[in-house]
């Protein structure tokens, strides 16, 4: 039995010129039927609305269904070039000219990030996120390769607070109008499309805080800090 499972999260049809080993060993997962050149595909059943939670939906499903100790997750447009073989790997950090907080405020919505931080019930977590948002670095995209246990810890830190926050959003328009976000995100030309991305915008920043503040080391050599008991 293999000790790893490789997944590709697919929102749309894709038929890339991927090598045969990739087509044979990666399993496509989606919330609706999509076409691909992968050998195996699964349409997942979920309690979450994919329009609101994006990749968090898939991670939740993987944690409930994956039977191997190691896992890799790829986006259908961003793929790892080999199966998972060892320690956690994630996207390369990108240095920012401004803090992650100011970057989010300018590109998306200051009110959105302020409201999210205010919604955090745990004071230690709120302090950690507030300080983490002052970093001038971001780890983008949605690639992961490593132990399923680390993915579960990521989920507890990143996904759970976002899910609770999303449940409380009554009107996304206040975030869209406040920042002119639809003008910046020209491809997402209405508030419904923007709403689909809110969880993704937040999870990208929370993921950065998880890897840089909750974990230590560098990509490929990640170990959890023992003093973060709230995870």
Residue ranges of predicted features:
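ER/Golgi luminal nucleotide-sugar-dependent glycosyltransferases, focusing on the catalytic module
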Residues: 1-231
């Amino acid at each position: 039995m293999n000790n790893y499972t490789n997944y590709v999260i697919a929102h749309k049809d894709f038929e890339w010129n991927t090598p045969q080993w990739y087509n044979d060993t990666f399993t496509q997962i989606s919330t609706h039927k999509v076409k691909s050149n992968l050998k195996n595909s699964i349409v997942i059943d979920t309690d979450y609305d994919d329009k609101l939670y994006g990749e968090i939906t898939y991670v939740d499903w993987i944690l409930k269904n994956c039977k191997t100790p190691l896992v890799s997750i790829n986006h259908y447009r961003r793929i790892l070039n080999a199966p998972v073989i060892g320690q956690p790997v994630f996207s390369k950090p990108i240095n920012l000219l401004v803090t992650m907080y100011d970057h989010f405020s300018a590109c998306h919505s200051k009110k959105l990030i302020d409201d999210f931080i205010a919604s955090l019930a745990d004071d230690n977590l709120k302090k950690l996120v507030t300080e983490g948002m002052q970093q001038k670095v971001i780890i983008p995209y949605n690639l992961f390769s490593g132990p399923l246990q680390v993915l579960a810890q990521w989920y507890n830190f990143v996904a759970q607070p976002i899910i609770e926050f999303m449940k409380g959003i009554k009107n996304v328009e206040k975030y869209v109008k406040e920042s002119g976000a639809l003008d910046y995100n020209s491809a997402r030309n209405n508030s419904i499309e923007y709403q689909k991305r809110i969880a993704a915008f937040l999870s990208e920043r929370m993921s950065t805080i998880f890897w840089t503040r909750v974990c230590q080391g560098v990509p490929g050599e990640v170990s959890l800090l023992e003093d973060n008991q709230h995870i």
